[in-house]
Design a protein with these regions (language model features):
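Hydrophobic alpha-helical segments
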Residues: 1-228
């Protein structure tokens, strides 16, 4: 069942009840986003105050399977969704996570955060391609706190990214599976970066473009301080 349908099926719980569990005694460290115009339950993707969805995907650079909730109870986690031939928002989305990784290394909190970019173009985005793409954006993809997740095939990508995380994407007529960079957009897609806390709840869902790096770092710092 799609995430949106699951949320609607649980509508009896009510948005008001959900909001009532937030705040100082709730599952989040941050307050409701100032720019939040829609109720989280009306959004297809996980939003403020909601639990992180669960899916298990290969992490080819580390040669193991990783569950999206693997670090719940241990680390705050950042997710984003991309394809490496993207010439628009995807490089910035990845660079944001790389900047967090660098800041964590420099300030000594690498073991408090996990970075999980997820590709939805598994045919083209092989282990080597993912590694080179991450390194070009300033990341250390071999580090333990960087898990570049790659679905096994297109169907699994749709299941996890499109359905479990509620982020739509679609191949364009320019798509080729293995002919390199066509310098055109192979996918139409929305952008999303999720900041989830150590307890597995969404603190921020940055949608509609790449968030400013300083905003992400400031939000992460506030979350870290809250859970110290």
């Amino acid at each position: 069942m799609h995430r949106r349908n699951l949320l609607r099926a649980a509508a009896g719980i009510g948005v008001v009840a959900a909001a009532g569990c937030l705040g100082e005694d709730g599952p989040t460290a941050l307050d409701t986003p100032d720019d939040q115009q829609a109720d989280p339950a009306d959004l297809a993707y996980p939003a403020y105050g909601q639990e992180l969805p669960e899916a298990t995907l290969p992490s080819p650079i580390h040669d193991r399977e990783v569950n999206t909730r693997e670090f719940v109870g241990e680390r705050h986690t950042l997710f984003t969704f991309l394809f490496t031939r993207c010439h628009e928002v995807c490089p910035a989305l990845t660079a944001n996570l790389a900047q967090v990784q660098t800041d964590a290394t420099e300030d000594g909190y690498s073991d408090e955060v996990a970075l999980m970019p997820i590709t939805f173009d598994p045919v083209y985005d092989t282990e080597e391609v993912l590694r080179e793409f991450a390194e070009a954006r300033g990341a250390d993809p071999g580090a333990e706190n960087w898990q570049f997740l790659r679905p096994e095939n297109d169907e699994r990508a749709e299941e996890v990214v499109g359905e479990t995380f509620g982020l739509p994407f679609q191949k364009t007529d320019a798509y080729t599976p293995d002919e390199g960079d066509s310098h055109e957009m192979e996918f139409d897609h929305q952008s999303l970066t999720l900041l989830t806390n150590v307890d597995g709840y969404v603190e921020r869902a940055y949608a509609g473009g790449a968030p400013q790096p300083d905003v992400v770092l400031d939000d992460l710092t506030a979350v870290r301080n809250h859970f110290e």
